[in-house]
Amino acid sequence: MATSHGVLRSLDNAKTQSYHYLAIVIAGMGFFTDAYDLFCITAVTKLIGRLYYSDPTNHSPGILPTNVNNAITGVALCGTLAGQLFFGWLGDKLGRKKVYGITLTTMVGFALLSGLSFGSTPKTVVTSLCFFRFWLGFGIGGDYPLSAVIMSEYANQKTRGSFIAAVFAMQGVGILVAGGVAMFVSKLFLLYFPAPDFETDAVLSTQPEGDFVWRIVLMFGAVPAALTYYWRMKMPETARYTALVEGDHKKAVEDMAKVLDRNILSEESNTRIAIRPLESHSYGLFSSEFLNRHGLHLLGTTSTWFLLDIAFYSLQLTQKDIYPTSGLVYKASKMNAIEEVFQLSRAMFAVALIATVPGYWCTVFLIEKIGRFRIQLIGFLVMSVCMWFLGHNYRSFRGEESACKNGSKYSFCNGNPVMFAILFGLTLFFANFGPNSTTFIVPAELFPARLRSTCHGISAAAGKSGAIVGAFGVQSYIGNSHDKSKGTKQAIMALAVVNLLGFFFTFLVPETQGRSLEEISGEEKDFQGNNADEEISGERNGTRNASVDKSPETSMV
């Protein structure tokens, strides 16, 4: 029987097998749902505003009040933060597998309920929607640490970064599909329920059938994740958790034998090292030992993720406001309610296809060649430069309202929407081929097995607190500015400074490329020291540790 050290070596040295790809799909579908549910709301908030907050005395389409808009877009992020902390801790206490199914069930259930938000008044509809989206976010939050840690503990040493990045890249696919589904559903409804634009007829421009559009869009995200529920439940516990945390080395071997090539396990089983992790490194999260070993690491992962998400979510959640002013979408009064969803989602889809998704997959293919550290540094730096130019030249890129002729479909004219789109696209590309991916990957590698999920959850929660700053703080600042153009310019330039801070905080995070998880976390030294002490003790007593003396074929811990 292979020892637990042999199992860990087997995992690190295993060739890429079909099960690795299956694990990517299973974990990745959770992230597909995560991204879809968090970002599809951007495509439909303006529709909800037209449906529930229209004012007949106002000569412009209905919009969500700033506080309501912030609540709808930000409440899921609050739930996500809570879920990351809770399920991250629970994943270390109960095991990755036991908790994994709970997060998926929560996501699927509350994604469906979000589309069934009920009430006869705007207040009750929005309240029920926010309630369901908070708990949707709670489930999404649990998927962050669990998916990252499961993939890192299953993966081999050579391609671990690419595998974790591939799981996270499904976030990009989720953003793309969110735009695609909203575009398809709105186009379908436009064909069957045409209506004049707002300027032609303010009342008829808001089709009552639009109430089905936003509900269908919100509910669709549950479908792909639900299809993977069976396989998620069939996944065995990771060998690293079973061996290093539970101390059940025999079961770790049996579990991995089910999913990995048995020949690989037998080839690696001739090690004679038996590890006793619970005795050799029992320091806790709040101990001075953890602070000495990993305090700066945790500061680095939390600070960089926090700073990144301020900028990333500010851009993603304000797309609905940025696109019309940049000339990528018609002004609201020149569209009916469902057409506005189509225009916004088409812009979202195009930007995701050209900039967002390629950034994720560049990380997948290049992370093991360039390394996490360099990708994160380059990403933060390019984001900072692009956003500085975008903010500094915002008015010239946007154009002027006075330059538009009567009957123009655009809010601003004589700007430079092409240059705006290029800089905006580059920012998103280098966010994803940069810190948005690496801040997810590195916390799943840096910390010891029994604290790995907790520390990833803490890092991710720090990121979501940054996202909340973006969703509530940045959006409120722009929304409450007397001169929205000036407010947007100042906000974008401030985000450039935030990215620059992320660049410098990256130096707190070490490179993890090309090393085993046990070497990175320091567990390997603990194992070696523990076994050396046991061997010396055995020699003093005239005997040697049984797990060292026995032949590999009969050694069992």
UniProtKB/Swiss-Prot annotation:
Signal peptide: none annotated. It is a multi-pass membrane protein. One of its GO terms (molecular function) is symporter activity. It comes from the Eukaryota. It is found in: Cell membrane. Keywords: Cell membrane, Glycoprotein, Hydrolase, Membrane, Phosphate transport, Symport, Transmembrane, Transmembrane helix, Transport. Belongs to the major facilitator superfamily. Phosphate:H(+) symporter (TC 2.A.1.9) family. This is Low affinity inorganic phosphate transporter 8.
